[in-house]
Structure formats: structure tokens, C-alpha cells
């Protein structure tokens, strides 16, 4: 990140320290004696904005660097050298509302860059930022960070920046060796619910689990069905929950007051909680193709199971399968990442393995 500052595409495994890499780089590159905003970090979700701001503050605690955040219900009263926000807020707060502040910007980080570029709304905001830099002849270093970059994403980046430094991994290097990947055959969607119910019957109160579901509708249905069975579960959604409720849910989950969290992909990327030892894919993630068909969402799969096995700890990812296309998609994921997803032997073995992981970490 020294002069001359090249733009960088950096790929690294989930849980390997990407935040530390760009966080330390950002903090060491800004002038702490200047009150101008010099670096902006773009995150996909509110939860990640809050999480990353906190981590950057820890890294900067022995400096005069001030980290600020912009949220839908929170704008800073004072400015700092580094701002964390979503791409949409970069456009609305930075490019439109406070355009005079952008002249001192020298670094822009896109965390989970592949999803920011793929998403129509966030990519539009980022493209407007790039256009502004070009129009104003600004020399802004762009850092693209993610565990996953497909060919189309890399092409989009190179269309804007012909000269970027690439740090890439082979696909087979991306699969997470600290995460035991399993699948469980269920005879129906109701059988998937029964599996989770059986797990909750015998799990201890200290074991936290994230359950990923593909649609908001089924997030709500799964919560309702499990609650009727007497299970205490909580949900996390994006725009369908108020910011205050989202913040409180994450706070309680981190503290261990909530053990079971059902969510959509809003929590699939970047969320960091070492105590999560089990991730369950109620649905395998899929992405709609141009012809209307569905293919496995390989990137989302890797990011979902990457919510466990963080920073050298051990974890388990269980994929629940019932329809024939579930097994086809599972095989495609195995082939794509050149990995093996084993059939789960028994609930008892799963619990024994989880218990061992918790013991090893304590």
C-alpha cells in the first residue's frame, strides 16, 4: 500500500484474516493528524458495517485514528479518517450529500467485493463512485477483497481497472479444511424440520447454530413450526426487520443469549463469531440462470459454511437434502471445489463431534 498505490484484487479463505489485512493496511496508510476522510470501507450489510468498525477501532486504539460509520438510522456528528458504510450509503451520503468530503479520499475497500459487483443495486453505487473518481481525476486505490471471485466478476473489475495486482487462489484451495462438510438425507421438507427439532432436543444451551434458508417466507415458516414444537429460535432478516431489532438480535447471539438463529443470506458473508460450531443449510443455496433454471450458488455455499471453523477453530456444516435436485447440486458443489461431502452417520456422532470442538476451544 506504499506509493505508487496499485489497485489490488485479493482472494483469501474464509476466516483467514482478510479484515486484518485490509484493516491494518488502511490504518497505516491514513494521516492520523488530518481530520479528513481518507479511506472508505464498503460492506454488504448493516451487521458487517458495525462489526468491521469495531474491529478497526481495536486495531487503531493506540493511535489518533478515528473510525466512523454511516447507517440508515445513524449519521456521524463528527468526521474521522476512516468511514465504514454500505455501497448505497457511499452514494447517498458521500457522493450526493457530502461530495465536498470526497476530495481527500485516497483508498476505497470493497469487502465481499464479488457480491457487491454482482448485486444490481450495490454495483450501481460502486460504478458511480468509480465514475466520480475518473471525472475528478482522483488517484484512489481500490482494494477488492473476497474469498470468491468468478470469471465474470474479475472481468468487470478489469473493465474499470486494467492494471490491478491479483492475489488469487485455486478453487480447490478455497474449501475449508477446518469445516467438516456433511449431508443428511431427509424424505421431505417436513423431514428437514424434524432433523432440526431432533437436534434441538439433545443440544446443550451453550451450542450456537446458524440455520440458512433460501427465502424469507420459509425463514418465518421454519420459526413458526419449530416454536409450535416448543423450540426457542430466533430469526435475522434484512429489510424486513427494523435496524434496532437486527442489532439486538446480533448482540444477544454474540453474548450467547440466543443459541439458534435462522436467517437468509444476510448473515452468509463476513459475520465472525468463533463460538459457532455448526451451520445447517436447510436449503442448498442456488442462483437463477438467464434461461430460468437454477444452479448451485457456489460462492454462497462457501461463505455460509465459512461462518464456522473461523481462525483455526473446528466446525461442521450440515446440508439437508430431500429432492433429487438437492443431490445433483451437492455433487456439483463437490466437483466445483474438488472436495468430499460425507453422509452424516448419526445425530449422536454429530453431537459428540460438536462437544469435542467446544472442549478443544475452552
Summary of predicted features, one role per range:
Residues 34-96, 104-107, 224, 231-236:
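Conserved nucleic-acid-binding Ia/Ib motif block in the N-terminal RecA-like helicase ATPase lobe
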Amino acid at each position: 500500500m506504499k506509493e505508487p498505490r496499485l489497485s489490488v484484487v485479493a482472494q483469501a479463505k474464509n476466516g483467514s484474516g482478510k479484515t486484518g489485512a485490509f484493516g491494518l493496511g488502511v490504518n497505516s496508510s491514513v494521516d492520523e493528524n488530518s481530520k479528513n476522510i481518507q479511506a472508505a470501507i464498503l460492506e454488504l450489510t448493516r451487521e458487517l458495517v458495525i462489526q468491521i468498525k469495531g474491529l478497526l477501532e481495536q486495531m487503531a486504539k493506540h493511535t489518533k485514528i478515528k473510525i466512523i460509520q454511516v447507517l440508515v438510522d445513524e449519521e456521524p456528528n463528527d468526521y474521522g479518517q476512516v468511514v465504514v458504510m454500505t455501497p448505497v450509503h457511499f452514494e447517498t451520503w458521500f457522493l450526493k450529500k457530502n461530495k465536498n468530503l470526497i476530495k481527500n479520499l485516497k483508498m476505497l475497500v470493497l469487502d465481499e467485493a464479488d457480491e457487491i459487483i454482482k448485486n444490481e443495486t450495490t454495483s450501481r453505487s460502486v460504478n458511480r463512485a468509480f465514475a466520480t473518481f475518473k471525472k475528478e481525476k482522483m488517484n484512489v486505490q481500490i482494494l477488492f477483497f473476497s474469498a470468491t471471485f468468478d470469471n465474470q466478476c474479475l472481468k468487470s473489475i478489469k473493465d474499470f481497472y486494467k492494471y490491478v495486482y491479483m492475489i488469487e487462489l485455486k478453487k480447490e484451495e478455497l474449501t475449508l479444511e477446518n469445516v467438516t462438510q456433511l449431508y443428511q438425507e431427509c424424505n421431505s421438507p417436513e423431514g428437514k424440520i424434524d432433523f432440526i427439532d431432533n437436534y434441538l432436543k439433545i443440544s446443550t444451551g451453550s451450542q450456537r447454530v446458524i440455520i440458512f434458508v433460501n427465502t424469507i417466507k420459509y425463514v418465518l415458516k421454519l420459526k413458526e413450526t419449530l416454536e409450535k414444537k416448543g423450540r426457542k429460535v430466533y430469526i435475522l432478516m434484512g429489510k424486513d426487520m427494523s435496524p434496532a431489532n437486527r442489532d439486538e438480535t446480533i448482540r444477544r447471539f454474540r453474548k450467547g443469549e440466543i443459541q439458534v438463529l435462522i436467517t437468509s443470506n444476510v448473515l452468509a458473508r463476513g459475520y465472525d463469531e468463533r463460538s459457532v460450531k455448526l451451520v445447517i443449510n436447510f436449503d442448498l443455496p442456488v442462483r437463477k440462470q438467464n434461461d430460468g433454471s437454477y444452479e448451485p450458488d457456489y460462492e454462497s455455499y462457501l461463505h455460509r459454511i465459512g461462518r464456522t471453523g473461523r481462525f483455526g477453530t473446528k466446525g461442521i456444516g450440515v446440508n439437508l437434502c430431500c429432492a433429487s435436485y438437492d443431490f445433483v447440486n451437492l455433487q456439483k458443489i463437490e466437483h466445483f471445489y474438488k472436495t468430499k461431502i460425507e453422509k452424516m452417520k448419526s445425530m449422536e456422532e454429530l453431537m459428540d463431534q460438536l462437544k469435542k470442538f467446544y472442549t478443544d476451544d475452552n
